UniProtKB/Swiss-Prot annotation:
The gene is KAR2. GO terms for biological process: chaperone cofactor-dependent protein refolding; detection of unfolded protein; endoplasmic reticulum unfolded protein response; ERAD pathway; fungal-type cell wall beta-glucan biosynthetic process; karyogamy involved in conjugation with cellular fusion; post-translational protein targeting to membrane, translocation; protein localization to endoplasmic reticulum. It comes from Saccharomyces cerevisiae (strain ATCC 204508 / S288c). InterPro entries: ATPase_NBD, BIP_NBD, Heat_shock_70_CS, HSP70_C_sf, HSP70_peptide-bd_sf, Hsp_70_fam. This is Endoplasmic reticulum chaperone BiP. Residues 1-42 form the signal peptide.
Amino acid sequence: MFFNRLSAGKLLVPLSVVLYALFVVILPLQNSFHSSNVLVRGADDVENYGTVIGIDLGTTYSCVAVMKNGKTEILANEQGNRITPSYVAFTDDERLIGDAAKNQVAANPQNTIFDIKRLIGLKYNDRSVQKDIKHLPFNVVNKDGKPAVEVSVKGEKKVFTPEEISGMILGKMKQIAEDYLGTKVTHAVVTVPAYFNDAQRQATKDAGTIAGLNVLRIVNEPTAAAIAYGLDKSDKEHQIIVYDLGGGTFDVSLLSIENGVFEVQATSGDTHLGGEDFDYKIVRQLIKAFKKKHGIDVSDNNKALAKLKREAEKAKRALSSQMSTRIEIDSFVDGIDLSETLTRAKFEELNLDLFKKTLKPVEKVLQDSGLEKKDVDDIVLVGGSTRIPKVQQLLESYFDGKKASKGINPDEAVAYGAAVQAGVLSGEEGVEDIVLLDVNALTLGIETTGGVMTPLIKRNTAIPTKKSQIFSTAVDNQPTVMIKVYEGERAMSKDNNLLGKFELTGIPPAPRGVPQIEVTFALDANGILKVSATDKGTGKSESITITNDKGRLTQEEIDRMVEEAEKFASEDASIKAKVESRNKLENYAHSLKNQVNGDLGEKLEEEDKETLLDAANDVLEWLDDNFETAIAEDFDEKFESLSKVAYPITSKLYGGADGSGAADYDDEDEDDDGDYFEHDEL
């Protein structure tokens, strides 16, 4: 291939054209390293990462798992749920993540962030981003060409990038793991859709950094699910379709599994198709029905839409196991109740076009891998949306009646597989024989003369991989060449995604076709790309690891976000301390009152009884006046003051003292007294 300088800039021209005229011998390099991210554990290969966790960072729900002593555990959050909503909310008092955030969305739609995975790593002007903004109740703004969310934090407008919001969700997963393990966690394996491009993968790694996690691997979700599925399979080779229909993304992968070796043969999918799209169809139907009945259009009412979205998701789940469901919302709008019946048949009718749309990527992976339907041994269902009966029916019908395997929990399979990969990296027992070969999802190449896309690494090539090729100039005495790096499957570079560009300068004057410029693409196990160009005559080299040209975060931005994440964590800790101190004081005061008015009061002198009641009432009145404004130390001081009043009196009954111990009151006494009166409320 040759570089060509045009008036519009320096481009590339195929070498064969100049070769024919100049008889220049070009030697393409064939050193493609088909080494994969091999998960074979050797004694010298494992670094001491401590416990490495596996995280499925989902569009609607996230899940965290860990492998300990050869056993993989899916970890439950503080609500006891094994999957956590990928929601972050901001109130005037605190930041909420997970179930707590999702539960208050109807009352606080503009400050409750969800579906952030649909925005991460993309440009603000991307068609998909603009389409999503129309459906999101919170404000999405343009920040340096990238989407960001604007919320009100303590009365002030604050802007968060998708990486920051995702970092908060990853931080929640980290906390769940640390609560379970009782130790700090610093390393993780995080999954992404197979069709995520380079920018989206790097943005996900940045989110991990913001959360205080070193993301050791970015793993394709279907690949992780295949690990979960394949651990107990037989030794003979299996061809498996992994059909992953989640909340916001859809992926299909064709994998072969043999003797513990996983190889991704082909991947396809849609980054904007999932359960939430099915929910929106229900929401639109409910809006239409409500308008017809009551003449009120709620399509621009964010609070009403949040209520509809919540009920639509419930209805969708119910219809996977029953033929109809009732959707009822009291005082939906203007005091008017909403009451509608949705049948499974109507739900299927509303979404049939989307259900059928999922079969297109299935066809594509079969074409790409050169297999026929009959060659597929197993169909694996992943993602909560695969519970929909019509989805299963259409897929099984496409494969001529072959039944889909339902042996793994579709919500947990991806996190399970991520934890197995994490276990390999941390040196866990029981995974020595697992090998994983992953592939790149999109073709990578450079622009040549005429705007042609010239591939170097074709899609579905096993990674990590490294490919090099010799190019040359197409203009006499050309001193500079421009390398434009693209990803995509289109023939013309303008129809593909520009990853980045750089110049190689200082090429000595020479006739066209004489300089030899070696361009090397190195794609690592996370799908992160480094491109270099070397003038073989002078040895001069330039390179790029695709970063800001793709709208990624700068190190300064990451550092700032890490600092802000730590600040939020500190604020969260302060709020938690305040709430605990406040509850401790309130419980203590009420406990004193109840006991004085109960059995304890019968044993007290009237003066002591009055002293305790007055002290407790004073504290409760103070709490009413200062409930929100006081800080943890204020509550602790009040607790100590009340304890000093109560201790001399209660010690007469329980300690046999004469009351003179008040002057000798110390922290130990406070703890003992506090233990007596303070209990968790049921």
